[in-house]
Swiss-Prot record:
It comes from the Bacteria. This is Universal stress protein Slr1101. Coiled coil: none annotated. It comes from Synechocystis sp. (strain ATCC 27184 / PCC 6803 / Kazusa). It holds the Pfam family Usp. Disulfide bonds: none annotated.
Amino acid sequence: MDEIYPAVGNELTMEVWQQQWQTFEQEGLDTLEKRRQQALALDIECQAEQILGSPGKIICQRAKQDNSDIIVVGHRGRWGLSEILLGSVGNYVFHHAHCCVFVVPTPD
Protein backbone atom coordinates (compact mmCIF):
# COMPACT_ATOMS: atom_id res chain seq x y z
CA MET A 1 0.00 0.00 0.00
CA ASP A 2 2.08 2.86 -1.30
CA GLU A 3 -0.85 4.99 -2.37
CA ILE A 4 -2.34 7.84 -0.37
CA TYR A 5 -5.87 9.01 -1.01
CA PRO A 6 -6.98 12.44 0.21
CA ALA A 7 -10.14 12.71 2.29
CA VAL A 8 -12.57 15.00 0.52
CA GLY A 9 -15.58 16.76 1.92
CA ASN A 10 -14.20 16.93 5.45
CA GLU A 11 -13.93 20.45 6.84
CA LEU A 12 -12.35 19.24 10.07
CA THR A 13 -8.72 20.24 9.76
CA MET A 14 -6.05 19.23 12.23
CA GLU A 15 -6.01 22.77 13.60
CA VAL A 16 -9.77 22.77 14.18
CA TRP A 17 -9.58 19.30 15.74
CA GLN A 18 -6.80 20.43 18.11
CA GLN A 19 -8.82 23.49 19.15
CA GLN A 20 -11.88 21.34 19.80
CA TRP A 21 -9.81 18.84 21.80
CA GLN A 22 -8.25 21.62 23.91
CA THR A 23 -11.72 23.03 24.63
CA PHE A 24 -12.98 19.56 25.60
CA GLU A 25 -9.94 18.99 27.80
CA GLN A 26 -10.28 22.39 29.52
CA GLU A 27 -13.98 21.84 30.21
CA GLY A 28 -13.09 18.56 31.91
CA LEU A 29 -10.40 20.23 34.01
CA ASP A 30 -12.78 23.04 34.97
CA THR A 31 -15.42 20.51 36.08
CA LEU A 32 -12.85 18.59 38.12
CA GLU A 33 -11.63 21.74 39.84
CA LYS A 34 -15.20 22.80 40.64
CA ARG A 35 -15.94 19.40 42.22
CA ARG A 36 -12.61 19.43 44.08
CA GLN A 37 -13.41 22.83 45.57
CA GLN A 38 -16.85 21.56 46.65
CA ALA A 39 -15.21 18.61 48.42
CA LEU A 40 -12.60 20.82 50.09
CA ALA A 41 -15.36 23.13 51.35
CA LEU A 42 -16.78 20.08 53.16
CA ASP A 43 -13.34 19.24 54.62
CA ILE A 44 -12.99 16.22 52.35
CA GLU A 45 -9.38 15.58 51.38
CA CYS A 46 -9.20 14.95 47.66
CA GLN A 47 -7.17 15.27 44.52
CA ALA A 48 -8.33 15.57 40.95
CA GLU A 49 -6.65 14.70 37.70
CA GLN A 50 -7.80 14.05 34.18
CA ILE A 51 -6.47 10.85 32.62
CA LEU A 52 -7.16 9.71 29.08
CA GLY A 53 -8.55 6.19 28.82
CA SER A 54 -11.32 3.89 29.97
CA PRO A 55 -12.68 5.44 33.19
CA GLY A 56 -13.62 2.18 34.92
CA LYS A 57 -10.26 0.54 34.27
CA ILE A 58 -8.33 3.64 35.28
CA ILE A 59 -10.30 4.05 38.52
CA CYS A 60 -9.68 0.40 39.46
CA GLN A 61 -5.98 0.58 38.56
CA ARG A 62 -5.49 3.83 40.47
CA ALA A 63 -7.32 2.55 43.56
CA LYS A 64 -5.15 -0.56 43.61
CA GLN A 65 -1.97 1.48 43.05
CA ASP A 66 -2.91 3.83 45.91
CA ASN A 67 -3.98 0.90 48.13
CA SER A 68 -7.42 2.49 48.56
CA ASP A 69 -9.88 1.06 51.08
CA ILE A 70 -12.99 2.23 49.25
CA ILE A 71 -14.02 3.76 45.93
CA VAL A 72 -17.00 6.11 45.83
CA VAL A 73 -18.47 6.42 42.37
CA GLY A 74 -21.59 8.13 41.06
CA HIS A 75 -24.29 6.48 38.98
CA ARG A 76 -26.53 8.49 36.65
CA GLY A 77 -29.48 6.14 36.77
CA ARG A 78 -29.03 3.81 33.83
CA TRP A 79 -30.35 0.42 34.86
CA GLY A 80 -31.38 -2.76 33.11
CA LEU A 81 -31.06 -3.00 29.33
CA SER A 82 -29.86 0.60 28.96
CA GLU A 83 -26.90 -0.09 31.25
CA ILE A 84 -26.06 -3.35 29.47
CA LEU A 85 -26.10 -1.70 26.05
CA LEU A 86 -24.41 1.57 27.00
CA GLY A 87 -22.20 0.40 29.84
CA SER A 88 -21.60 1.99 33.20
CA VAL A 89 -18.44 3.14 34.92
CA GLY A 90 -19.97 2.38 38.31
CA ASN A 91 -20.95 -1.11 37.16
CA TYR A 92 -17.46 -1.82 35.83
CA VAL A 93 -15.79 -0.54 39.00
CA PHE A 94 -18.22 -2.49 41.19
CA HIS A 95 -17.30 -5.76 39.45
CA HIS A 96 -13.54 -5.22 38.99
CA ALA A 97 -12.25 -3.23 41.98
CA HIS A 98 -9.97 -4.85 44.54
CA CYS A 99 -11.68 -2.99 47.38
CA CYS A 100 -15.16 -1.97 48.52
CA VAL A 101 -17.19 0.19 46.14
CA PHE A 102 -19.89 2.62 47.21
CA VAL A 103 -22.14 3.52 44.25
CA VAL A 104 -24.05 6.76 44.84
CA PRO A 105 -26.98 7.77 42.63
CA THR A 106 -26.43 11.28 41.31
CA PRO A 107 -29.27 13.78 40.91
CA ASP A 108 -30.49 14.43 37.38
